[in-house]
Amino acid sequence: MAFPTTSAQQAETNRKILEDIQTKKQLLAGGIINLGLSNTNQMPSPQLLGQPTVAPEFLPQGVGLPTNATPPRSAFNPTSSTTLGFFIPQDSYFGNSFIPVLPRLEPLPTTTAPATTTASHIAPK
């Protein structure tokens, strides 16, 4: 029968794929995979979110940096001084250099208008 052989081959193939994936996970976690970005045997350190971006030494100055690597603070002070809320500055790779935090305003209490009486000459008869 050919079916047990096929399922055994499929199981072996699946096992090899899972082993390969596990090996790659361990290499990524250990930082062993070389991306070929430099001629040295060292892997460039991964860029973590929230850290300032600096160009690696093998790139010329200004190459490889996003245009918003240094968030513009010139818009931060006037904006934060003219609004009801406040802003949290952040290093963002998406162009938004600060997050607005607006206060939660309670609704105004409804005031009841005093009952008006109509004049007798206007009231319906």
From Swiss-Prot:
Q: What InterPro entries does the entry give?
A: SOSSC
GO biological-process terms attached to the record: DNA repair
Q: Which residue ranges are recorded for the region named Disordered?
A: 43-77
TM spans, by residue? none
Compositionally biased spans, kind Polar residues: 67-77
Q: Which domain of life is it from?
A: Eukaryota
UniProt xrefs under Pfam families: SOSSC
Give GO cellular component annotations, separated by semicolons.
Answer: nucleoplasm; SOSS complex
Q: Which family does it belong to?
A: Belongs to the SOSS-C family.
PANTHER family in the record: SOSS COMPLEX SUBUNIT C (PTHR31526:SF2)
Can you say what this protein is called? SOSS complex subunit C homolog
List the source organism: Drosophila persimilis (Fruit fly)
